[in-house]
Amino acid sequence: MWAYESVFYQIYPLGFCGAPFENDGVLEHRILKVNDWIPHIKKLGADAIYFSPVFESDTHGYNTRDYTKIDTRLGTNEDFAQVCDNLHKDGIKVVLDGVFNHVGRGFWAFQDVLKNRESSPYVNWFGRIAFDGN
């Protein structure tokens, strides 16, 4: 398997790109900063990048609210595709850290539970939720 033979360079993109901790929804094309680092990453001998969470989240990236969208603090899906294309052109593979065992409070299905409570079709997605005030 290729991963066993690879040298990985890990990037926590929200920190690496200087994004604010709280997601205020303001679009910034920060992920493009990675393009400037490709020569350095290659010089280190890395042939794979491990990106910590890149999906839309409320704060630190591990509380995802949209798995189909790059965090607006980092840019657009097109920005990220450009970065991945440039990495691939230089022979660097891309691995994403997907956090799929939990979501953030901003996740659409959880928002539906907050709004519709027990009548939400997604209430069972979230284990034991107490609606009695506790």
Where are the regions that the model predicts?
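Acidic/aromatic-lined carbohydrate-recognition and catalytic surfaces
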Residues: 1-134
